[in-house]
From Swiss-Prot:
Present with 752 molecules/cell in log phase SD medium. This is Tryptophan permease. The lineage of its organism: Eukaryota, Fungi, Dikarya, Ascomycota, Saccharomycotina. InterPro entries: AA-permease/SLC12A_dom (IPR004841), Amino_acid_permease_CS (IPR004840), Amino_acid_permease_fungi (IPR004762), APC_YAT (IPR050524), RNA3'P_cycl/enolpyr_Trfase_a/b (IPR013792). Belongs to the amino acid-polyamine-organocation (APC) superfamily. YAT (TC 2.A.3.10) family. NCBIfam families: 2A0310. GO terms for molecular function: amino acid transmembrane transporter activity; aromatic amino acid transmembrane transporter activity; catalytic activity; high-affinity tryptophan transmembrane transporter activity. One of its GO terms (cellular component) is endoplasmic reticulum. Required for high-affinity tryptophan transport. Also transports cysteine, phenyalanine and tyrosine. One of its GO terms (biological process) is aromatic amino acid transport.
């Protein structure tokens, strides 16, 4: 065993030298863990565990930041400690945040209650196709980074590099914004305390959670999502009571505001504006599959199916009911992104319920912290995936003994320090332009997922593989991904339209140019990154394009090791069972 361990270390050192000699970049090589290497790794960890009794807590903490004992930099060093309950709650409450609680105010003002229903229904329908397509691939290939890895495999390395880079930049810039938003939210109760103090506290909390590893992230998100879900459920019940006249004023509201001032504001342009807001409120939906390298893939299908109910219940129903309680002409819906602009808070205040605004404000604070927590998780895992594909320097993929992608966490944490500009007079303008760099990231990522799933299905067909080989099959299939791709293109066009002809008009040509570039600067940045990476790729490989023919796409590397015959038998048995059940039971299993 000692000789095997020494030879394993030598191989790892040779691999490390090879990486360093290539200017920090590595060629993408999928790594298969052999039984012998797994045995050596397990033996090393066993020896390490035996030493724990001889070390104090401080020593163990310091050692956890060191590189793995076998010297490898493989993504297999990530810990699969996320449990199904974590995934399900991340799926249910993961994207319930400021987009729903605050951003929806602008949507109601510009589109009216009916425009909100139409916009969120369209955006939500494409999410179902996107997440089911991503889930199908992820269960088949449960690797860290999910779509960041699949873009290289099914599309083109340059496309994957652009999409992953923009996605990472988005989370880099969102983190300081969310920390500032959390500090400003506290001002609702006490404005006498310097916001810099709150920035420091929230920054420390978010970074500390992620330093506890994926288990810390999972437990925090489980708690955050549970609170958010309970709050939305309670608010839905409250809305029904108020609409029916059960409030303090005992006034029956019904569809009063749908008639006066009306159900649709600004016509078709208003619906387009709502569509853009809705798409960003649903951002982060892909987080469920992003954690596939750190959880048991068996829990993914159930978590993926929860997305349908989340969109229906937490977004469509809650926003429809808010539209019955708040007229779109309410001035508090416009002119800001603070708690006072939340349609949920406005609805409660309009009907004179005194204690609840503070409760909703507390939930908004939790939502902001949840998004900040997700920022570091998403960016660090994507950077780790990019590093192991050879798209960026290998040291971005460093994973310590505790299974943390440490360099990725540190990189986003450094950007988080920008939150201390909270008292700067030009802070708002600076962050508006920083966010413009990654402004289209959400839709671009979803579009790449749709195209990856379409190429995956076509590759399976070209290579003579059956869908019976898949443990999880998208409920909407390849046509669902095609529909989602079409809707994502429509959202990008809608944002282009709203950038050129914003609702309310503009005062000057300078303002028009500013609005356009803040909305579409991302497209120019992406084009520049794509061209630069294409030149680099050409120099490295001698080819301009890395798109593979369908028959040449690798459908085996990183594939989950399963017995296809057993999978087919399990699917057949489940089908026989469901065929004997009533239609509503079949529908429940289909969507849940």
């Amino acid at each position: 065993m000692t000789e095997d361990f020494i030879s394993s270390v030598k191989r790892s050192n040779e691999e490390l030298k090879e990486r360093k000699s290539n200017f920090g970049f590595v060629e993408y090589k999928s790594k298969q863990l052999t039984s012998s290497s797994s045995h050596n790794s397990n033996s090393s960890h066993h020896d390490d565990d035996n030493q724990h009794g001889k070390r104090n807590i401080f020593q163990r903490c310091v050692d956890s930041f060191k590189s793995p004992l076998d010297g490898s930099f493989d993504t297999s060093n990530l810990k699969r400690t996320l449990k199904p309950r974590h995934l399900i709650m991340i799926a249910i409450g993961g994207s319930i945040g400021t987009g729903l609680f605050v951003g929806s105010g602008k949507a109601i003002a510009e589109g009216g209650p009916l425009g909100v229903v139409i916009g969120w229904a369209i955006a939500g329908s494409q999410i179902i196709g996107t997440i089911h397509g991503l889930g199908e691939i992820t269960v088949r290939f449960p690797v860290v980074g999910a779509f960041a890895n699949y873009g290289t495999r099914f599309l083109d390395p340059s496309i994957s590099f652009v999409v992953s880079t923009i996605y990472v930049l988005q989370w880099f810039f969102v983190l300081p914004l969310e920390i500032i938003a959390a500090a400003m939210t506290v001002q609702y109760w006490n404005s006498s305390i310097d916001p810099v103090i709150w920035v420091a506290i929230f920054y420390a909390v978010i970074v500390s959670i992620n330093l506890f590893g994926v288990r810390g992230f999972g437990e925090a998100e489980f708690a955050f999502s549970t609170i958010k879900a309970i709050t939305v459920c309670g608010f839905i019940i409250l809305c029904v009571v108020l609409i029916c006249g059960g409030g303090p004023d005992h006034e029956f509201i019904g569809a009063k505001y749908w008639h006066d001032p009306g159900c649709l504001a600004n016509g078709f342009p208003g619906v387009l504006s709502v569509l853009v807001v809705a798409s960003y409120s649903l951002g982060g939906i892909e987080m469920t599959c992003l954690a596939s390298g750190e959880t048991d893939p068996k829990g993914l299908p159930s978590a993926i199916k929860q997305v349908f109910w989340r969109i229906l219940f937490f977004f469509l129903i809650s926003l429809t009911l808010v539209g019955f309680l708040v007229p779109y002409t309410n001035q508090n819906l416009l002119g800001g992104s603070s708690v006072d602009n939340s349609p949920f808070v406005i609805a409660i205040k309009l009907h004179h319920i005194k204690a609840l605004p503070s409760i909703v404000n507390a939930v908004i604070l939790i939502s902001v912290l949840s998004v900040g927590n997700s920022c570091i998780f998403a960016s660090s895992r994507t950077l780790c995936s990019m590093a192991h594909q050879g798209l960026i320097p290998w040291w971005f993929g460093y994973i310590d003994r505790a299974g943390r992608p440490l360099v990725g966490i540190m990189a986003n944490s450094l950007f988080g320090l920008l939150a201390f500009l909270v008292k700067s007079g030009s802070m708002s303008e600076v962050f508006n332009w920083l966010m413009a760099i990654a402004g289209l990231a959400t839709c671009i990522v979803w579009l790449s997922i749709n195209l990856s799933h379409i190429r995956f299905r076509l590759a399976m067909k070209a290579q003579g593989k059956s869908l019976d080989e898949l443990e999880f099959v998208s409920a909407v299939g390849i046509w669902g991904s095609a529909y989602s791709a079409l809707i994502n293109c429509l959202i990008l066009i809608a944002q282009f339209y709203c950038s050129l002809w914003p609702i309310g008009g503009w005062t000057s040509g300078k303002e028009r140019a500013k609005i356009f570039f803040q909305n579409y600067l991302c497209a120019l940045i992406m084009l520049f990154i794509f061209i630069v990476h294409k030149i680099y790729y050409k120099c490295q490989t001698g080819k301009w394009w890395g798109v593979k023919a369908l028959k040449d796409i690798d459908l085996e590397t990183d594939r989950k090791d399963i017995d296809i015959e057993i999978v087919k038998q399990e699917i057949a048995e489940k089908k026989m069972y469901l065929d004997s059940r009533p239609w509503y039971v079949r529908q429940f299993h289909f969507w849940c």
